[in-house]
Regions:
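Alpha-helical transmembrane segments and their immediate juxtamembrane cytosolic regions
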Residues: 2-387
Length: 387
């Protein structure tokens, strides 16, 4: 009997050693970043740079260039927020699947700290960049914390509810209150009522309904993103939905306006895909294009993992926070320092060339920086303060 127990203990120890070896072999692949996510994040940041430079530096000139730049309006930012939701899911998936409450508590606290960090960073330069998304971002994250362990159905219903609630709010409150749309200034931003109104209802990226982008991203991140069938199906479904919404929007405005320019302008606010106000047609348009871009990036990055462009965009996406802040402080700051009185008066071609040039510098910086450092400058500070 003793001999049997001794033999059993040896076998158990051997089994444990084998298990540890297997875990060490398997874990790295499980923890490996999905390259396509970072590539999509890089493209989203570049899209936001194009949109924001166009607004701030100037968009005078050729209509076709303005139309091209206008493609990114609201869509790059929506993709950026959806990707944040995906990131939150990837942070929490392991703890939730293993029902590891202590690990989940640590991750929840980390998300809470990062939300506060982003809120403070965003608010700190709102005076020079009123269209900041980071302080909104922080509030979205605080709300998503409430849904970390919720069922997927609850997450989707909550996200759709936020989209539906917004037009209901419009029937009670004036969307234009506080705004000077000629200068894009929010007149009572620094009052309690004005700040809360801007944050939740009629700011550039209001909590209602923009939090739904992050909730949809969180739902998406909980899926099996290494399942090729799911990724390809999502790509085609969302691409078709996006195209159908664009067609529906265009023909609805054309038919109902009957060629009247004033009517077309008014109808565009309701049936168009512009981000302000963020009505359901824009929200679903933003969600569909975000999923289409993310899944396309996952598919392409998987097939061309060693491609120099994919590698560069992968590294750029990992420094997305740094580049978002840099495009305001450095990118816009340089142009304003050269000629403050001309801000907003430059041609759209100049704004586009400058945006693409700045984006290229960001990519080169990311490639060089990642050779020496694991995290971007601002990402490193955030992790030091929140991990």
């Amino acid at each position: 009997m003793r001999g049997f127990l001794f033999l059993l203990s040896i076998l158990l120890r051997q089994g444990q050693i084998v298990q540890n070896i297997l875990n060490n072999l398997i874990q790295p692949s499980l923890k490996k970043r999905i390259i396509g996510i970072d590539v999509a994040r890089a493209l989203a940041v570049i899209g936001m740079i194009i949109v924001n430079f166009k607004i701030v530096i100037g968009e005078n000139g050729l209509n076709w260039v303005k139309s091209f730049a206008g493609i990114f309006d609201g869509k790059a930012a929506a993709t950026f927020v959806v990707l944040a939701g995906v990131g939150l899911a990837l942070m929490t998936n392991s703890a939730i699947k293993n029902n590891d409450k202590s690990k989940l508590k640590i991750v929840r606290n980390r998300i809470l700290k990062r939300a506060l960090f982003l809120f403070i960073i965003g608010i700190s330069y709102t005076t020079i960049w009123p269209a900041d998304i980071l302080h909104f971002y922080g509030i979205y994250m605080l709300i998503v914390i409430l849904f970390l362990t919720s069922k997927e159905r609850t997450i989707i219903i909550s996200a759709i509810s936020l989209i539906i609630i917004f037009p209901i709010l419009l029937s009670f409150w004036n969307y234009e209150i506080g705004w000077n749309f000629e200068t894009l200034e929010y007149q009572d931003f620094w009052t309690i009522n004005g700040f809360i109104r801007n944050l939740f209802f009629n700011g550039f990226h209001p909590v209602i309904p923009w939090t739904s982008f992050m909730l949809f991203g969180y739902w998406f991140g909980k899926q099996d993103l290494k399942n090729n069938k799911f990724i390809k199906k999502t790509f085609w479904v969302c691409t078709i939905i996006f195209i159908l919404i664009q067609i529906l929007s265009y023909f609805s405005i054309s038919i109902l306006s009957e060629g009247n320019q004033e009517s077309a302008k008014e109808l565009t606010e309701i049936l168009g895909t512009n981000p302000m106000p963020p009505l359901p047609i824009y929200m679903f348009n933003g969600i569909s294009i975000a999923f289409a871009i993310i899944t396309a990036c996952i598919i392409i990055a998987k097939h061309f993992e060693n491609n120099i462009i994919i590698k560069a965009l992968n590294k750029t996406g990992q420094l997305a926070l740094t580049f978002y802040v840099a495009h305001v402080i450095i990118g816009m700051g340089i142009i304003e320092a050269i000629n403050p009185s001309k801000m907003g008066e430059y041609s759209v071609i100049f704004s586009m060339i400058y945006a693409l040039g700045f984006s290229l510098i960001c990519i080169l910086f990311a490639v060089i920086w990642k050779k020496h450092k694991e995290s971007g400058p601002l990402e490193w500070i955030m992790r030091k303060l929140t991990d």
